[in-house]
Curated annotation (Swiss-Prot):
UniProt name for this protein: Vesicle-associated membrane protein-associated protein B
Sites of N-acetylalanine modification: 2
Cross-link (Glycyl lysine isopeptide (Lys-Gly) (interchain with G-Cter in SUMO1)): 147
A Gene Ontology biological process term: intracellular calcium ion homeostasis
Lineage: Eukaryota, Metazoa, Chordata, Craniata, Vertebrata
Length: 243
């Protein structure tokens, strides 16, 4: 016996499209229309009932009326190979006089009275998720570039400060060199003047003259030593900055 042709109109007719990402519930609508002059019973079936929630999944459509069915795809990890397993079927039949117990109505229905339409599922990914590998590469490359450019940027920001510090240290070094040279000259002159005064004031073999000359020389030597140590420290600082 030939199968009865579906009397309900379906929109869409052949495909249910679900647009991702599929990390949350994705809903699409199926419109069922009854162009006949009789009431029609319907129910919606799927090959993967755990993945979908259909509201309403069954009922009666009055003559000349239509009904929107919400098909809700539950969140899942998208697998392109799995979409061929997701299919829906809209089954219908003309409603009997008594439709108070729809479960009994479907159980008692004869196969030749049943009409059905099949729809396949289509999963669409947004453009930015179409090529996840490319997206990951795009995310990685700018991050790597920013890490590479960061030291250069830091260097360009800090280099003027380093140059200024070096100039200051060099100026201080030159000043200290001049100070050391001046003290050396002063020390030499004092030695000559003290020697002349001591020789004029007392005999050269006098212990007092020897102690006076020694005290002044030690004072100058201490100042010179302090300046030399400071000059050495400045030199070490310059060496570290240059490195």
């Amino acid at each position: 016996m030939a199968k009865v042709e579906q009397v309900l109109s379906l929109e869409p007719q052949h495909e249910l499209k679900f647009r991702g990402p599929f990390t949350d519930v994705v809903t699409t609508n199926l419109k069922l229309g009854n162009p006949t002059d009789r009431n029609v019973c319907f129910k919606v079936k799927t090959t993967v009932p755990r993945r979908y929630c259909v509201r309403p999944n069954s009922g009666v459509i009055d003559a000349g009326a239509s009904l929107n069915v919400s098909v809700m795809l539950q969140p899942f990890d998208y697998d392109p190979n799995e979409k061929s397993k997701h299919k829906f079927m809209v089954q219908s039949m003309f409603a009997p006089p008594d439709t108070s117990d729809m479960e009994a109505v479907w159980k008692e229905a004869k196969p030749e009275d049943l009409m059905d339409s099949k729809l396949r599922c289509v999963f669409e990914l947004p453009a930015e998720n179409a090529k996840p590998h490319d997206v990951e590469i795009n995310k990685i490359i700018p991050t790597s570039a920013s890490k590479t450019e960061a030291p250069a940027a830091a260097k360009s920001l800090t280099s003027p400060l380093d140059d200024t510090e070096v100039k200051k240290v060099m100026e201080e070094c030159r000043r200290l060199q001049g100070e050391v040279q001046r003290l050396r000259e002063e020390s030499r002159q004092l030695k000559e003047e003290d020697g002349l005064r001591v020789r004029k004031a007392m005999p050269s073999n006098s212990p007092v003259a020897a102690l006076a000359a020694t005290g002044k020389e030690e004072g100058l030597s201490a100042r010179l030593l302090a300046l030399v140590v400071l000059f050495f420290i400045v030199g070490v600082i310059i060496g570290k900055i240059a490195l």
